[in-house]
Amino acid sequence: EVMGIPLKEPGFYVVELASPRLGSALLGAERPYYVQTTALVTNLSVHLKLGREASLVWVTSLDKAQPVVAAAVEVRDCDGRVHWKGKTDAQGIARIEQPLPNVATLPYCFRNWDRKYFVTARTDGDFSFVFSDWNEGINPWRFHLPTGGYNGPFLATSVMDRTLLRA
């Protein structure tokens, strides 16, 4: 059963629906089945790029795919502690020109291994967010790209070629 929910204003909504049809199909009785979900109604898209020495947040509009100027941006952990706040520039970019704490040192969110940043963007009348670990649908393995779990300070690649060794 698919149905639209008439949420007319931007915001983050927590919704509970009662479905008699699902109740009779899933519960085997004539009573409603309750389904809870959340819905984000927004015209903002928030993009996060974490770096070791600096990071950035890019905010764009969904309807025009244009940068959003002067959006208020906050970077928080799951305890709600603010690690950075600022505004986007003319290109819709908020430049975080300082190292953020390593994700491994953040307080956990839902499980002991689940640590992430929660980044919000606000404009007059609109709000959106992104978590630093959201990658559903763009996982590297889907595109046959190699991945690894190294978080150290240095990464080196060796190039070995016979012509290089002959010198």
Where are these regions (language model features)?
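N-terminal, cleavable Sec-dependent signal peptides of secreted/periplasmic/extracellular proteins
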Residues: 1-167
